[in-house]
Amino acid sequence: MAEISATSFPSSSSSALVIRSSHNGSLKCQNVAVPKTTSQFQELSLKRSQLVGNAVVTGHVTGSRSCKNQAIRAVLSGDGTALTTDSKEAGLRGKLKKVVLAYSGGLDTSVIVPWLKENYGCEVVCFTADVGQGIKELEGLEQKAKASGASQLVVKDLTEEFVKDFIFPCLRAGAIYERKYLLGTSMARPVIAKAMVDVAAEVGADAVAHGCTGKGNDQVRFELTFFSLNPELKVVAPWREWEIQGREDAIEYAKKHNVPVPVTKKSIYSRDRNLWHLSHEGDLLEDPANEPKKDMYMMSVDPEDAPDQPEYIEIGIESGLPVALNGKALSPATLLAELNTIGGKHGIGRIDMVENRLVGMKSRGVYETPGGTILFAAVQELESLTLDRESIQVKDTLALKYAEMVYAGRWFDPLRESMDAFMEKITETTTGSVTLKLYKGSVSVTGRQSPNSLYRQDISSFEGSEIYNQADAAGFIRLYGLPMKIRAMLKKIS
């Protein structure tokens, strides 16, 4: 049996946990009853009293609960490791020099700052990406970050890069996950993670950290990007390590560490917003039978309350990418922002779906993507003029795999990059304009034109044509239907 002792060291050192296997015997230790099962480690905590029948510890022991749990693991392994809780030293998980944390300013990421310092003995640099989530989300972040213990806050405007280099390639590819989801969160994570890698290099950090839970997709999206762009960086995911189980635990931890707790009312929904979309999850949405409340939506009006008069708009497209609105050339981010306003006014782009998460479970989400819904309708419609049947079929097939890879966080995978090269080539003639009618939640195409159109009115017309001889169809039909005819003949003989 292994043992733990709580002792004190001279000078300025604080109390420490000293762990030795029982055969060592050089220290006088208090006995610990080691449980036969290891399934309840997270429920253990070094206290004076008996802990749910798993261990009995006497003597004063200091340190965070996470440190104590780690101590118990070391006891069970009997590896003779000595671990201290001196705040000047590294935490029980080992020392890191400097960590770049993806920071939102909310309760969770604010609590992560002191947790990283306590458990890894590191300096924390907070990073916030502006991907079009709104100016209110960015207000007061530097003050919050430093009050939580961060050495600095780095903010970068990634909006144009996000739209140009991440959203528009997915739009050109026609990438839609499970027939509905336009990949709003999936596309945002790699651009944020990429910027974190850049910031880590700029500030000399040896690690990055995120606040994603162990149940979601985002942890994968962040970490696959880190692996792809700098495999030397260490990755810390507190939600997979700490004992904080929810909001109340986080608030208690924040108070103990003098972290200012946000006083804003906690939303009953879990939301993610960027320039492309706004997602809603949680609360009554967790039951797929429940209808979303009208006051949940933030980017779009209820279609029933939308204007009674339709609005017509024209989208200009070059080589498969939108470049203009109503004849006016706009930057990618500006164009999308304009369409969000117009589409939201008409109740465009609401999606309610149950999707298969990458980690195996199903989840229900409601998404608002007004501008994106309009752009998908425009680009796909113009392709109907400029692409032949085989090209459309192959492109649509690859679009499914493309969407799957983006959803799974494999943005920097060579396969996605190779498919992107195909999409760029196949859409190089997709240039022209599309006119759409927006009315009470619907997007209807009313016109399309392209200098590269494969549509020929003189051929397709029911009127007489010198190019297309209708008599030619007879031979084509005989050859095209020959296998079916032979099969029918065999059935008749048998």
From Swiss-Prot:
Disulfide bonds: none annotated. GO terms for cellular component: chloroplast; chloroplast stroma; plastid. One of its GO terms (molecular function) is ATP binding. InterPro entries: Arginosuc_syn_C (IPR048268), Arginosuc_syn_N (IPR048267), Arginosuc_synth (IPR001518), Arginosuc_synth_CS (IPR018223), Arginosuc_synth_type_1_subfam (IPR023434), AS_cat/multimer_dom_body (IPR024074), Rossmann-like_a/b/a_fold (IPR014729). Keywords: Acetylation, Amino-acid biosynthesis, Arginine biosynthesis, ATP-binding, Chloroplast, Ligase, Nucleotide-binding, Plastid, Transit peptide. It catalyses: L-citrulline + L-aspartate + ATP = 2-(N(omega)-L-arginino)succinate + AMP + diphosphate + H(+). It holds the Pfam family Arginosuc_synth. Residues 1-73 form a transit peptide. Coiled coil: none annotated. It comes from the Eukaryota. Its EC number is 6.3.4.5. It is found in: Plastid, Chloroplast. ATP binds at A102, Y103, S104, G105, G106, L107, D108, T109, S110, A129, G211. This is Argininosuccinate synthase, chloroplastic. It comes from Arabidopsis thaliana (Mouse-ear cress). The lineage of its organism: Eukaryota, Viridiplantae, Streptophyta, Embryophyta, Tracheophyta.
